[in-house]
């Protein structure tokens, strides 16, 4: 039995691609037909490719490696955060800061600063500081938490794969992953270049339900890999 069914994919609208004028010809093998000026993705291929991606992610997870979830577009933010947290993984869902992986030592300093302010908030330091100072620190904390909260405990050397929603939008993240030799699994819509990705899951990257469905399956793969047992449907 496949990890994801045609019925689930259809119900979530995974088959809807972009308008025909906004396409990447390299996605032609994954396109089933064109309807009302929109490309329809071949879901049989999505089923097969999702299975390949699932097995790869499961294998990476079994080896004790981490998966970094990346999706900063509005439609992906919640699913990326929720599913990364559910599978005890790391995520970037607000903004990809340049050098997040390739210059991790600098990013680490910002993470340390985030922990510092969190400690101040927890140990009562905020209560003895001037109000103006506290407002400033809270603003800094909010910004740091937004950008770095999902990678607070990331060990850059232990990333086994990156899962991405929309490779076009996340091209900077993908190019850093490539530099470090980190394989990329991604939901790839009809306007993207599949050659940028190691494990292509052809599908709609603009519908919240479609993104949630596939992202949740990748989280399931991680959990199955860690537990070494099939997760009940």
Curated annotation (Swiss-Prot):
Keyword Ribonucleoprotein in record: yes
Record-level GO BP terms: translation
Gene3D superfamilies, per the entry: Glucose-6-phosphate isomerase like protein, domain 1, Helix hairpin bin
PROSITE patterns in the cross-refs: RIBOSOMAL_S2_1
GO molecular function, one term: structural constituent of ribosome
Keyword Ribonucleoprotein belongs to the record: yes
Keyword vocabulary terms for this entry: Ribonucleoprotein, Ribosomal protein
Domain of life (superkingdom): Bacteria
GO terms under cellular component: cytosolic small ribosomal subunit
CDD domains the record matches: RPS2
Annotated family: Belongs to the universal ribosomal protein uS2 family.
NCBIfam families, per database record: rpsB_bact (TIGR01011)
Listed HAMAP family: Ribosomal_uS2_B
Annotated protein name in UniProt: Small ribosomal subunit protein uS2
Source species: Clostridium botulinum (strain Eklund 17B / Type B)
């Amino acid at each position: 039995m496949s990890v994801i069914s045609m019925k689930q994919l259809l119900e979530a609208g995974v088959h809807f691609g972009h308008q025909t004028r906004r396409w990447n010809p390299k996605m032609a093998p994954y396109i089933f037909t064109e309807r009302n000026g929109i490309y329809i993705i071949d879901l049989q291929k999505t089923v097969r490719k999702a299975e390949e991606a699932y097995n790869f992610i499961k294998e990476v997870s079994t080896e004790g490696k981490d998966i970094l979830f990346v999706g900063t577009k509005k439609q992906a933010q919640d699913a990326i955060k929720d599913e990364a947290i559910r599978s005890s993984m790391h995520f970037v869902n607000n903004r990809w800061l340049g050098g997040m992986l390739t210059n991790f030592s600098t990013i680490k300093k910002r993470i340390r600063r985030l922990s510092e302010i969190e400690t101040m908030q927890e140990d009562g330091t905020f209560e003895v500081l001037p109000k103006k100072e506290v407002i400033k620190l809270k603003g800094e904390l909010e910004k740091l938490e937004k950008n770095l909260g999902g990678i607070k405990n990331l060990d850059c050397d232990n990333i086994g794969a990156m899962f991405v929603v929309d490779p076009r939008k996340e091209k900077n993240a993908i190019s850093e992953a490539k530099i470090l030799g980190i394989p990329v699994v991604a939901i790839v819509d009809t306007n993207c270049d599949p050659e940028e990705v190691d494990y292509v899951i052809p599908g709609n990257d603009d519908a919240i339900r479609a993104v949630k469905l596939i992202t949740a399956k990748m989280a399931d793969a991680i959990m199955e890999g860690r537990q070494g047992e099939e997760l009940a449907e």
